[in-house]
Amino acid sequence: MAVSCVERGYAETTVEEVIARAGISPEAFARHFNGIEDCGFAAINLIVAEIGAVASAAWSSDSSEAESVLLAIKALLELLAARPSFAPLIYIQGRYAMPADSYAPYRASIEVLASMVDRLRAYAADKDQAPKTAAAGVLGSAGMAMRRAILAGNIERLPELLPDIVYGVMVPFLGQKEALRYAGQARELLNEGG
């Protein structure tokens, strides 16, 4: 489903094409899905689950909240680069081309990620420095940078956005100096290849 959506767009993806790509019978498809919308919704849910898994796995009691956020962003970008059909489906097709219900899992995942990012507020010198909507705002900005890269055909280069996204996510909570420090750590991780 995801590959077909990337190649043809959701509107042009057919059950027949999905069946052919998956190598299954129409009966097998019908046992699992009530049509292309249902299949698309399942694909979105799968991607959201994988994003949640890699983001959660990045959190460690051995790391600070900010380091965990950095590692979660890194893991997300690496997942999307490694699974190139995921990024356009979740960030483009699922958001703009599929039925409105398909956007709900993405929105729910953003709320979970925003609550993770908002935990940085506890480490801010001025706890009221960032507005209440800062976490959602920085994730929206990160999503826009990712969508631009996806639309430009640079999915495999998504991990290169790590320093910029880390800076943008950290600055409202930790201030410029700390955000620059974590962006520098992100750049070092990229340069080390890990």
Language-model segments: which ranges?
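Short hydrophobic clusters on alpha-helical segments that form packing/core surfaces
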Residues: 1-5, 29, 51, 76
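Short, structured motif recognition centered on aromatic/hydrophobic residues
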Residues: 10, 51-52, 89-90, 142
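Short, basic, alpha-helical segments at the C-terminal edge of helix-turn-helix-like DNA-binding modules
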Residues: 15, 43-53
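Hydrophobic alpha-helical connector segments
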Residues: 42, 56-85
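Amphipathic alpha-helical segments used for helix-helix packing
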Residues: 68, 80-100, 114-121, 147
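C-terminal peripheral helix-coil segments that are non-catalytic and often amphipathic
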Residues: 78, 115, 119-122, 148-194
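Amphipathic alpha-helical packing segments from all-alpha helical-bundle domains
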Residues: 98-123, 129-144, 159-168
